[in-house]
Amino acid sequence: MNSLLRKLSWRIYHAVHTNGLAADVVYWSAFYFQNFWRRRNYRRVSQNTVSPEELWEHRHLEPSATLVTGVTNICNAKCSFCAYPKVVANKTLQTGIMPFDVFKRAVDEWAAVGGHSLDLTPVVGDPLVDPGLLEKVDYAVNQAHIKNVVLTTNAILLNRNDTYKRLIDLGIGGVFISTQGASREVYEKVYGVKHYDDAMSGIRNLLEYNRAKGEPSRVVIRFRNAEKPSQIIHSKDFADNIKPYLSEQVRINFTVDFDNWGGTIQPTDLSGFMRLRKLPPPLNVPCQNLFNFAVRHDGRVRLCGCRLTRSDLDDLVVGNIREKSLEEISKSDQAWSVIKGFYSGKRPETCLECTFYNPIDRRWLERRASVNPALPAEKQVATAIL
């Protein structure tokens, strides 16, 4: 039964994403549906919030989450929907590449606690810029035995030194590709660089090689589209380089709305079909993204590996892996102070006007508790502290 449902689901998904009219209708409607669903969820959360006392005993790093190791915060694109070009222009971003010893320490600690998912994607930047990326992928997959190692890339450097082949051969779990569409002119406007051919060739080679190897890796092409989905679906490059390789393991999607990077991105930064996500109502509840700890290239540990406004060295930084373990940092007073601050309306700068906000709720807590039950001693400490 599950197999039949999966196949049916795939056929519906494929039909929508290869039919221009269907895709236009679905993604146009999704904007309004998602806004309705978010409002409903915010109302539900506000009526039955998770208390600090309940959260405290499940606040720390736990295996069902995703650890982010941002191997570099340097990018080779200047996307109009991303904060990277602005923080570089303002010279507020300290860039670098993660040394192998920092990466190894983070991965070893993550493997020791039973972590399943590792994301090599930085808050800003492209992981393929890191010349030591493949060594890190090899270590995480084949020596630390992390089950699900993934990364997001703009595909510009996939062809360099046959990176597309080596990622598949090393056993990467997933490659998520961020690209504009199938129009050179619009690509150059949105991504700010003239690498359309490099990206499209890299995508084609990755999909072709993955298919030849039996599709061991999941590939998802995420169109950050200024064009309507139908314009991309009907384009020659989509028909020649992407559509033939679509399968249950290889999928595409279009962007319903774009977040504002904590207020850094404004409607004037977007173009064409792009729409900005609406600002959520102020809820004094922590965000789920605070619990996906992110290790910066220099070893500093940050709550939230998703967004920044001016820098990734901000008030979301709560420690350094060179000085303390991830477990210690996740249980530290500094980390708890940031999380608990949400309950009194005190938020870090990046979080003040963030449209990516996703509040914790009862279901989230139940899932977290089911895989990481609190010890009696922790409950006693929580009662004493709170």
Explain the meaning of each model-derived region:
Residues 5-6, 10-174, 189, 193, ...:
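Conserved alpha-helical substructure of the radical SAM core
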Residues 50-54, 58, 63, 300-301, ...:
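Flexible mid-to-C-terminal extensions adjoining Fe-S/redox cofactors in radical SAM and related proteins
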Residues 61, 283-287:
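Short loop/turn motifs at secondary-structure junctions and domain boundaries
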Residues 75, 79-82, 287, 304, ...:
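Short cysteine clusters
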Residues 130-276:
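Conserved AdoMet/S-adenosylmethionine-binding subsite of the radical SAM
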Residues 295-298:
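Short, acidic, Ser/Thr-enriched surface-loop or helix-capping motifs
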